[in-house]
């Protein structure tokens, strides 16, 4: 199996400046955090290792020598520039934000299949690339993310804040009433702001907290949420629905809906709410469930999203589309 993955890191100010910039970033910020695409790729590789699947990473020379081999391109589309034009490609996940970025791709390349992480993303991509899009989520490390004893719980609620677009509006309509309610109940609260924490911080809080408030407008998969679910942490999840609202595309270019912030979910995971209007009522239901230990969020992840299961499904896709 030939896997291809690289983080995009183009030159910015002058040729080859990406190399000193990388060194400086590491010195100032520490090692690169495995979020999003990188975390998904690392989890795929871990899953392949666990099931004993054979693979090579970024073997461009080997692919040139065997142009009929399937190139499994994982990550952003800049990698396609390094893949021979005649090579068949299994493309995804974590690719274009929207196929409008290159609607003619299936005519330019031998794209055997495009992989996206959830059903709503599949429906959106199929509007531009019909007939070649399949759902494949990456797995979660359920041996690493495990529940901690109740005695270790010194935080009641972690607020996971991934609100970026229309920030001021949602601060007034969502964050302020949420924090007021948490304070009114006397709950011990910690906050993780997306982009400002390290994965080990979330891992540690997963051991310490009783519940998480998950605030994200929409998610293609929601790996961070699923990691906490695997750790036995129930979620109070904001799920507004409606349109996909990436401002690069919405509303002038793309109007697609409905979307969701928790594409892998059932009632064992916690409680969802739509916005400020139902926040307080829904949180009351949620917190009663937390205190009664009525949720079993880990069970959903173990049943549907283990590293081994998702890696096996990926191997099956490679076999199916590589022939």
Predicted regions and their residues:
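Conserved catalytic-core segment of nucleotide-activated headgroup transferases in glycan assembly
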Residues: 31, 124-127, 141-199
